[in-house]
């Protein structure tokens, strides 16, 4: 039986206007060559510079930080000039002796000798006939050198060409290039007959058709896809890049404002360099242009704790604190103040009004974070009380003042579907929640319908709890298809096209159909058990237990362990996968505490907690599993017995749209069969409904460059018979029914 009972005139909670937002992090080359419309790769020539305090291994093409974190590094300057090639007798080399300014680490010295140098762009430069592109460079030459700037095919066919005359010390030289042809694999070439030395300190190529026609702007099609989601806010700039994996790679606001050629570069822990062209100013400008709120995330004095962390000393913590303060003042101070004047100099005289949220760190936790969080929160709240401050851990559990906590979940779709009641038990006086990063990842790397179904089921629970869960944002946002570091991502692009995964369309449906308030309702549904499988893995104080044993079907475990004097960890139903694909349940026994935790993807869920007071040291530990049940005994006494949460066939949430006098019902069917749902309302409904449905023939169905809308919403008007509506298999649905 499937039924939704609704009381439209009984308000359960108000909607949170900020519930659906977006989160940008420069991952998968989402910045330069992506949302930031720059078309030249390595435009500042410093991509191959090894970050300070890191060592380079040429054999493995990796760098290692001072604390031991190893990261890919495939563009070392000792092995070529990344993105640039020379031909026809031209010779080029990098130098650190004659750079454009103190922010630039390298310049490019060239003797053309009748030849050319070429930039390949981001897997090619995409040009269109009749479209214009603005090129500029800072260059110098002791003698007059005439340089041809061309857009051309990789085979030498010229589409646009202009001549620049370079002479004397560094100066900015620019020109407009109008292409005569279409080509997604074009290149930019600089050529000259000169044999004299020419030095280039910075270069850039931008389309003139950017979002809002801004000169240092955003790629229009990608920005418009973001706005189509109707976001309430934008979280920026990360993500793990805020922390970095070393002191030098930690994010600093002051490196991201001013003329782009005067901004320090930033080696990102995702394995590439950014020139910070898409910086703090551009972030605020986009929020203002889009009419949305801004959330700024800043480093609180520590690097990424998942990457051999480094905890900054008090002096550097204070430096990071001042960096955060300066960012706030840059956005909001009058133009006649120090930081307001810097903003005005960059073209925005009036303060930005969009800054609303400040997040202290990213994915930080533990004692080191608590100490830094308190320092930042206490001082900032005193000086800037008007903002909402967000913690990255549940600092309220340690007695710290906490306004909002940023929860992150990367798991499989079933984890999301079974946890749609995760926030039901939160009290009205508990801390507010921001689900700042979430995505179904396991089995969904390319982005498919299955992921959207699980996420949608989870979000119905979030919508029911908007008095406690105030904001959400999917992550990551963008993926350049040629530079993938993380999947799935909401929007996939190359240098000329883009498409959105099914989760994008699900979120668009949800954001466009908010209603005015959540009304009282209850959902009646059948369930499927969550059957787990996998092997046992067990350790004591970090080392394997020799005496432990499991049966041949991996359904039971037994071991004699000195659990009073150590830490016992038994993983069961373990698939043995690591990282984001992991799925296992850990029984952890230490200091009399016995806890079962489910690790799924990058998420963890406490299944049960308890205590065990033992007489003597050694104990017999036994674990039995059976499909969706487990029992744990110590010395024959039952410590835990639990059944996993079942998977609801349908998940739903109901709001009332007061402007249209309609019920807005979001219904997710995660099964492989059609389901008839009866809708019963305390207030009479009309017998017609508008139903918008996201579905496909397969759970694995997704979109691509060739079929960008293979999985996209379709709207239909349907007739209700006795309040019954058909909800198709594998579908996300928004049903709107007028009240009489």
Predicted regions and their residues:
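Secretory/extracellular carbohydrate-interaction modules
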Residues: 529-595
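Aromatic- and acidic-residue-enriched carbohydrate-binding clefts of CAZyme catalytic domains
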Residues: 22, 53-56, 60-107, 242-280, ...
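An acidic-aromatic substrate-binding cleft motif
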Residues: 5-40, 46, 180-182, 191-273, ...
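Catalytic-core region of carbohydrate-active enzymes that cleave or remodel glycosidic bonds
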Residues: 377-389, 397, 403-404, 408-513, ...
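C-terminal beta-sandwich/jelly-roll accessory domains of carbohydrate-active enzymes
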Residues: 533-534, 538, 552, 577-580, ...
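Extracellular beta-strand ligand-recognition surfaces/modules
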Residues: 4, 137, 173-204, 341, ...
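Extended acidic/polar, glycine-enriched regions
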Residues: 115-228
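Short carbohydrate-recognition loop motifs
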Residues: 95-114, 531-544, 593-598
């Amino acid at each position: 039986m499937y039924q939704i009972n609704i009381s439209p005139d009984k308000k359960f909670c108000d909607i949170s206007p900020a519930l659906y937002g977006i989160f940008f992090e420069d991952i998968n080359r989402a910045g330069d060559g992506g949302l930031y419309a720059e078309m030249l790769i390595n435009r500042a020539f410093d991509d191959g510079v090894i970050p300070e305090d890191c060592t380079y291994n040429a054999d493995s093409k990796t760098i290692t930080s001072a604390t031991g974190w190893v990261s890919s590094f495939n563009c070392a300057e000792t092995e070529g000039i990344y993105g640039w090639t020379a031909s026809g007798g031209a010779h080029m080399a990098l130098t650190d002796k004659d750079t454009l300014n103190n922010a630039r680490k390298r310049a490019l010295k060239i003797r053309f000798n009748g030849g050319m140098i070429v930039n390949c762009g981001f897997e090619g430069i995409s040009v269109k006939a009749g479209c214009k592109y603005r090129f500029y460079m800072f260059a110098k030459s002791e003698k007059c050198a005439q340089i041809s700037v061309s857009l051309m095919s990789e085979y030498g066919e010229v589409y646009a060409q202009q001549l620049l005359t370079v002479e004397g010390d560094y100066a900015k030289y620019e020109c407009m290039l109008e292409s005569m042809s279409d080509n997604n694999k074009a290149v930019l070439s600089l050529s000259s007959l000169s044999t004299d030395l020419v030095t280039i300190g910075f270069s850039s190529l931008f389309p003139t058709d950017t979002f809002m026609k801004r000169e240092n702007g955003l790629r229009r099609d990608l920005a418009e896809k973001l706005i189509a989601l109707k976001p309430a806010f934008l979280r920026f700039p990360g993500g793990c890049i805020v922390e970095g994996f070393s002191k030098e790679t930690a994010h600093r606001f002051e490196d991201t404002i001013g003329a782009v050629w005067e901004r320090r570069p930033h080696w990102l822990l995702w394995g590439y360099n950014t020139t910070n062209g898409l910086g703090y100013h551009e972030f605020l400008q986009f929020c203002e242009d889009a009419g949305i709120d801004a959330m700024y995330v800043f480093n609180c004095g520590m690097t990424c704790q998942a990457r051999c962390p480094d905890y900054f000393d008090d002096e550097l913590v204070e430096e990071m604190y001042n960096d955060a303060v300066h960012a706030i003042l840059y956005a909001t101070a009058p133009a006649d103040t120090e930081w307001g004047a810097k903003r005005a100099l960059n073209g925005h005289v009036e303060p930005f009004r969009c800054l609303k949220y400040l997040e202290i760190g990213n994915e930080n936790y533990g004692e080191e974070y608590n100490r830094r969080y308190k320092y930042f929160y206490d001082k900032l709240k005193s000086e800037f009380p008007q903002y909402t401050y967000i913690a990255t851990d549940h600092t309220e559990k340690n007695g710290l003042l906490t306004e909002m906590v940023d929860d992150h979940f990367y798991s499989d779709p079933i984890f999301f579907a079974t946890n749609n009641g995760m926030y039901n038990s939160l009290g009205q006086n508990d801390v507010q929640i921001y689900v700042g990063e979430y995505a179904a990842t396991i089995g969904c790397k390319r982005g498919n319908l299955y992921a959207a179904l699980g996420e949608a089921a989870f979000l119905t629970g979030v919508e029911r709890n908007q008095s406690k869960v105030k904001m959400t944002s999917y992550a990551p946002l963008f993926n350049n298809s040629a530079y993938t570091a993380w999947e799935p991502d909401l929007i996939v692009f190359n240098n000329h096209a883009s498409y959105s995964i099914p989760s994008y369309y699900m979120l668009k449906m949800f954001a466009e159909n908010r209603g005015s308030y959540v009304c009282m309702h209850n959902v009646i549904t059948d369930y499927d058990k969550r059957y787990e499988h996998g092997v046992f893995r067990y350790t004591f104080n970090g080392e394997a237990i020799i005496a432990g044993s499991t049966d041949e079907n991996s359904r039971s475990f037994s071991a004699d362990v000195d659990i009073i004097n150590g830490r016992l960890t038994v993983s069961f139903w373990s698939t043995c996968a690591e990282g984001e694909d992991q799925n296992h349940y850990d029984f952890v026994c230490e200091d009399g505490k016995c806890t079962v935790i489910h690790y799924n993807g990058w998420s963890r869920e406490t299944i049960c907690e308890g205590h065990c007071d033992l007489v003597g040291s050694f104990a017999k530990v036994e674990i039995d599993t059976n499909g969706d049940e487990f029992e744990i005994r110590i010395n024959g006494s039952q410590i835990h017995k639990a059944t996993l949460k079942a998977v609801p066939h349908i998940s739903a949430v109901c709001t009332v749209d007061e402007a249209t006098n309609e019920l807005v019902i979001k219904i997710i069917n995660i099964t492989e069969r059609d389901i008839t749902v009866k809708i019963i309302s305390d207030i009479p409904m009309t017998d017609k409904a508008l139903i918008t449905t996201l579905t496909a023939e397969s759970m694995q169905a997704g979109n691509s460059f060739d079929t960008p809308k293979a999985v996209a919403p379709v709207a239909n008007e349907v007739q209700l018979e006795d309040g019954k509506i058909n909800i198709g298999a594998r579908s996300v649905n928004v049903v709107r029914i007028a009240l009489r």
